[in-house]
Curated annotation (Swiss-Prot):
The active site is at 281 (for beta-ketoacyl synthase activity), 434 (for beta-ketoacyl synthase activity), 472 (for beta-ketoacyl synthase activity). Disruption phenotype: Cells lacking this gene show an attenuated growth due to a defect in de novo fatty acid biosynthesis. Siderophore secretion and quorum-sensing signaling, particularly in the rhl and Pseudomonas quinolone signal (PQS) systems, is significantly muted in the absence of fabY. In vitro, the deletion of fabY results in an increased susceptibility to a number of antibiotics, including vancomycin and cephalosporins. The antibiotic susceptibility is influenced by changes in membrane lipid composition which lack a single secondary lauroyl group, resulting in hypoacylated lipid A. Pathway: Lipid metabolism; fatty acid biosynthesis. InterPro entries: Beta-ketoacyl_synthase, FAS_alpha_su_C, Ketoacyl_synth_C, Ketoacyl_synth_N, PKS_Beta-ketoAc_synthase_dom, Thiolase-like. Its EC number is 2.3.1.180. GO terms for cellular component: cytosol; membrane. Belongs to the thiolase-like superfamily. Beta-ketoacyl-ACP synthases family. This is Beta-ketoacyl-[acyl-carrier-protein] synthase FabY. FabY is a FabB/F homolog that functions as a FabH. It comes from Pseudomonas aeruginosa (strain ATCC 15692 / DSM 22644 / CIP 104116 / JCM 14847 / LMG 12228 / 1C / PRS 101 / PAO1). One of its GO terms (biological process) is quorum sensing. It holds the Pfam family ketoacyl-synt.
Length: 634
């Protein structure tokens, strides 16, 4: 009997805002929300973006005037809409019309003369080029003479062809929320996102730790691009060329595994299992598969799974743009048939499109096994039962889509059929497509989904694509999809792909239902298939069950009496979670960052033949019995 991995918390930040309590989802379907939910989310965004202040439970304008949620919507809604989701790259990241560049300049002295200039001796190159000579000058400087042609690199600026990205809400800076000095942006985001996920559970972290053994907590996270800004690998690689020194922090903080390490070391204080599995754009699902495996096998009882990616940098944009992968200004101009480009519609899954849109995002989910969730009264937002991963076989282009995704989608649907039945899959499931917004993706992914739907007798299969709203966050992309799916389970709304006028003519949709308007479901949706396709042949498809199905499974396994006791205990959890949400809406995000605190005294660790006792943990680590190979031994 396998343990069921249930989602008991989720949180993070992307272009839609804070993910916990479905606020990011609400932003994406803001037109379809009731006034109270809409105004609550807008007020929270206004505080995040520093448009209004929150003091003593009241919202205040810059001049101190009290504001009601209705006032905030009336006064700031349009500004919030313009400063969230995919949009033109903002100057705090870079100026897409004037990105710093080096231009090669060749200089030649006039015939019979030399090029001369003064400089400090400390500034001269070592060794001195053969065609340079120096002579003493006043004030301790030297006169440099260059006698032949030479090459210089001079500061210059030029425009990027790509000018849109999925950026965190304008004014929200994760590094301002804790002592983040020297931390790359991706690590800043991982700290605040993991905090949001932990706080969203409504259960004190120490309570969780006290109920499991020290090694029964696991964290699986990371990034695919590593940390490429000046505080990470970007600064490391550029330092010598810029004449700067490499710092002692840039190399270790640049690791792609460092989001995982920061969560263990500064947020959780965990000594449990840890890992960073990468699979291009399917990376989150790779880590989710590991989380599912360690819970179903009993190796862990609590797992934090997520990713953090901060790729809005000139180098990343140039790299993906050189591949022809990104939506360019000119490409969007040709699609729209006008000179004035709407960058908010740059990401167009399954419509007329010209490339994907890079985005930053950090998202985390908290998983528990079903027994622990019941014991602690955890609020269950869904369950994750399987992730299937397959490669593409032999390839020509390493970045082109391939056949592996047929295998993953088909296996995911077959798996769900065995759990919930064919009728539920046919009439109460939906797909969160990879939907990258490239011409190749819209054809190949839609054909895969259409053919699998045909094989299982599915008609009108609802398909959505969250990248239309928040862009493509690379490692974190399928986490954006999963958390959006939880919003659909909660509100019964499937986000429409509102950045397209219509589905492109070459999209296969005989058995699919793809809409550019939000779709409110008459009957509850019970199963979501998360699909992801990554460069290199990294294909993954996950199965997510609704909280209704998860609770039905728990009731059957543990009995009505145990479930009734759980429901009673859950009310306290929900109250604590709601209290955190209200504080967060007021700007109190309660970031967990324990630098150098509660360090474990290694000399106080007690090791015996039966167990290990670790200071600071209420339960010992008891060695598990291993009978895996007992049939092979005498």
């Amino acid at each position: 009997m396998s343990r069921l991995p249930v989602i008991v918390g989720f949180g993070g930040y992307n272009a839609a805002g804070r993910s916990s309590f479905h606020h990011g989802f609400r932003r994406m379907v803001i037109e379809s929300m009731d006034p109270q939910a809409r105004q609550e989310t807008l007020a929270g965004l206004a505080v995040m973006m520093k448009l209004v202040k929150a003091e003593g439970g009241r919202y205040l304008a810059e001049d101190g005037t009290p504001l009601s949620p209705e006032d905030i919507e009336r006064r700031y809604a349009e500004r919030i809409f313009a400063s969230t989701l995919v949009r033109r790259i903002e100057p705090q990241y870079l100026d897409p019309d004037a990105v710093h560049w080096h231009k090669v300049l060749e200089l030649s002295p006039a015939e019979g003369q030399a090029l001369t200039f003064k400089a400090s001796p400390k500034q001269l190159p070592e060794p001195l080029p053969a065609n340079w000579s120096i002579a003493p000058a006043e004030d301790g400087e030297v006169l440099v003479s260059i006698h032949e042609r030479c090459e210089f690199k001079v500061d210059s600026y030029r425009a990027l062809t790509v000018k849109s990205a999925g950026q965190l809400p304008t004014g929200f800076e994760p590094g301002e929320l804790y002592n983040s000095r020297f931390h790359p942006r991706g690590l800043q985001m991982s700290v605040v996102a993991a905090t949001d996920a932990i706080r969203s559970t409504g259960i004190d972290w120490k309570t969780i730790v006290d109920n499991v053994q020290p090694d029964e907590i696991a964290v699986f996270s990371g990034s695919i691009m590593s940390q490429l800004d000046d505080n990470g690998f970007g600064g490391l690689m550029q330092s010598r060329l810029k004449g700067h020194r490499v710092s002692a922090k840039q190399l270790p903080l640049g690791f792609n595994s460092m989001p995982t390490d920061f969560i263990n070391a500064y947020v959780l204080g965990s000594v449990g299992m840890t890992g960073s599995i990468t699979g291009a754009c399917a990376t989150f699902l790779y880590n989710l598969q590991k989380g599912i495996d360690v819970i179903t096998s009993g190796q862990a009882r609590v797992v934090i799974v997520g990713n953090s990616e901060a790729p809005i940098l000139p180098e990343c944009i140039e790299g993906y743009s050189a591949m022809g992968a990104l939506a360019t200004e000119e490409g969007l101009r040709l699609i729209e048939g006008r000179d004035d480009v709407d960058f908010r519609r740059a990401s167009r899954p399954f419509g007329e499109n010209c490339g994907f849109t890079l985005a930053e995002s950090s998202q985390y989910v908290v998983l528990m096994d079903d027994e622990l969730a019941l014991r602690l009264g955890a609020d269950i937002h869904g369950a994750v039962t399987d992730v299937f991963i397959n490669a593409d076989g032999f390839k020509k282009s390493i970045s082109a889509p391939g056949p592996g995704n047929y295998l993953t989608v088909a296996k995911a649907v077959a798996s769900a059929v065995q759990i919930v039945g064919l009728d539920t899959v046919r009439h109460a499931s939906f797909v969160h497509a990879h939907g990258s917004s490239t011409p190749a993706n819209r054809v190949t992914e839609s054909e895969i989904l259409d053919r699998v739907a045909s094989a299982f007798g599915i008609d009108g299969w609802p398909v959505t694509a969250v990248k239309a709203y928040v862009g493509h966050s690379l490692a974190t992309a399928s986490a954006d999809q999963l958390i959006s799916a939880l919003g659909t389970f909660k509100y019964g709304i499937l986000p429409g792909i509102k950045t397209i006028d219509k589905v492109a003519d070459d999209v296969h949709q005989q058995r699919l239902s793809i809409s550019n308007r939000d779709m409110r479901q008459d009957k509850p949706l019970e199963v979501c298939f998360i699909n992801s396709k990554g460069f290199g042949g990294n294909n993954a498809s996950g199965v997510v069950l609704s909280p209704r199905i998860a609770e039905k499974m728990l009731r059957k396994r543990h009995g009505q009496a145990a479930f009734a006791a759980y429901v009673e205990k859950r009310e306290q959890t929900r109250a604590a979670a709601r209290a955190y949400d209200q504080r967060a809406l007021q700007g109190d995000l309660e970031i967990i960052y324990n630098f150098g605190q509660d360090l474990i005294d290694e000399h106080a660790i007690e090791v015996s033949a039966e167990q290990v006792t670790v200071p600071g943990f209420s339960q010992p680590l008891v060695y598990k019995k291993d009978a895996r190979f007992s049939d092979m031994l005498d």
